[in-house]
């Protein structure tokens, strides 16, 4: 098993920056970048067509799907390849055919990647504080749609418990949880993730877990999501969650994502928890910390000065964090690659 120092060395950006913003985009591993470049050069030299190209690309899709399934504790047949968490939310909410008589319960601190697709549906949206979701459920509630980890507060909800207590279908935004905390999605209906955040993959990569693919209508068909199609547009959807694949993903992105998924090791969840706890404790000495103890990888605090200027100043010091616009908050992302030195640079920069 590689040491922490060996894993940290896999990320070139950490040679210069205290990179504490995986909640937006994770650091790209060297092996992922090298794989992307190598695959791009193959495409340049050999073209992007013909049987060898498509066989290679489809094989890479299968490989990535299997790795994501293992990470999310499901079968590969339950994983669709998407471009983002938002993609996954749109696929599910469009396929559920919600009407004005249907209610969807969600929290009041959701990302637009979930709340946007919700408002594009015809359902009535009921919002509640993240700790009062169950109280908002009524006889009209058809779906519960929540984040596993809030992108704002950094607090963690328990979608498995909510599912067990209500018996309702549940759509989970897993953008801030996949790769951060252990995930058992087997008891859940729909789980959408982004792969460029904590999984450290290339841009425009994501996944959607669909527990029972045959129960969700294909509302957004894509070219490679059918087993056959006719000139008139009729088609036969692929078996399993592949029927919900968003579309074509280039071989460079697939190669990079496959390598990125191999970088993390078994101790990553413990390391994230340890670094987040240390970060929270250090910030709590001087600031109001919004994130409760023992959550996930995000730590959100309220600065005592202008957050925009403070984030800019920190960047000048080589510390990368995220301002949460219109909320007067700053968010710190602690990954399995985060070191004590990174946190010391953050604290020093805030002085």
Name the predicted role of every residue range.
Residues 1-351:
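Pyridoxal 5′-phosphate
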């Amino acid at each position: 098993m590689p040491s922490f120092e060996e894993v940290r060395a896999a990320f070139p950006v950490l040679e210069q920056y205290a990179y504490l913003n995986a909640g937006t985009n994770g650091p790209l591993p060297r092996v992922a970048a090298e794989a992307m470049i190598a695959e791009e050069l193959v495409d340049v030299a050999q073209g992007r067509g013909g049987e060898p190209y498509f066989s290679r690309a489809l094989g890479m899709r299968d490989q990535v799907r299997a790795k994501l399934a293992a990470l999310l504790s499901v079968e590969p047949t339950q994983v669709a390849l998407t471009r983002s968490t938002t993609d996954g939310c749109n696929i599910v909410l469009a396929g559920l055919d919600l009407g004005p008589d249907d209610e969807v319960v969600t929290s009041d601190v959701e990302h637009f990647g979930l709340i946007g697709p919700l408002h594009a549906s015809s359902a009535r949206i009921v919002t509640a504080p993240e700790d009062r979701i169950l109280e908002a459920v009524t006889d009209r509630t058809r779906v519960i749609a929540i984040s596993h980890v809030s992108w704002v507060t950094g607090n963690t909800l328990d979608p498995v418990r909510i599912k067990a207590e209500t018996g309702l279908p549940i759509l989970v935004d897993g953008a801030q949880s996949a790769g951060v905390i252990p995930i058992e999605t087997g008891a859940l209906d729909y789980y959408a993730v982004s792969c460029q955040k904590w999984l450290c993959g290339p841009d425009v990569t994501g996944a959607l877990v669909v527990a029972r693919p045959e129960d969700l209508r294909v509302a957004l068909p894509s070219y490679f999501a059918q087993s056959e199609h006719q000139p008139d547009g009729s088609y036969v959807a692929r078996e399993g969650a592949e029927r919900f694949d968003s579309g074509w993903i280039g071989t460079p992105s697939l190669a990079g994502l496959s390598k990125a998924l191999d970088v993390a090791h078994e101790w990553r969840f413990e390391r994230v928890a340890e670094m987040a706890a240390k970060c929270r404790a250090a910030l709590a000495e001087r600031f109001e910390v919004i994130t409760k103890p023992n959550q996930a990888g995000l730590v959100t605090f309220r600065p005592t000065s202008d957050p925009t200027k403070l984030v800019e100043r920190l960047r000048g010091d080589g510390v990368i964090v995220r301002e949460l616009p219109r909320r007067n908050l700053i968010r710190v992302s602690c990954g399995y690659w985060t070191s004590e030195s990174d946190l010391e640079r953050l604290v020093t920069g805030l002085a």
